[in-house]
Amino acid sequence: MKIISWNVAGIKSRANEIERLMQEHQPDIVCLQKTRTDKAPYFDGYRVFVDCADQWSGVATYLHSSVDGKFTESDSHHLIIEFDEFVLVNAYVPYSNPKVPGYIEHRKEWDRWIVELVKNQSKPVIICGDLNIVHTDLDSSYPS
């Protein structure tokens, strides 16, 4: 099973690159984050599941036609697909900027949610995506 994950920062502007990536590497699953649209492009040989709420978030998961997976849940920050052998979470995790009121608590809620999801699964869970881990200021796109 070959899985590719990429924060595309806008799926429409990267459509040609995504298509080349799919043709070159022939992945079974492609997980994209920060898609910024609810209308993901279609690529030959793949079906797509997409969820987006605003211009800053969104996830899309492409499954090759030879892969059988069942969509189970999504919001603008995650999309879950269940397979026979595992559960896949494509995640664009909320940013946890301590300088913005409410961001830390929102991130903690997400962290609690993902821990419960993993604990309650009977199958292995694969989490891929942009985990937005900002351990130090150097990890930030907007350092002080």
Go through each PLM region and give its residues.
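Short amphipathic alpha-helices and their capping/turn segments at secondary-structure boundaries
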Residues: 20-23, 77-84, 112-123
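N-terminal, active-site-proximal structural segment of metallo-dependent hydrolase catalytic domains
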Residues: 1-43, 59
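Short catalytic/ligand-binding loop motif for oxyanion handling, primarily in non-cytosolic enzymes
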Residues: 12, 38-41, 96-100, 134-143
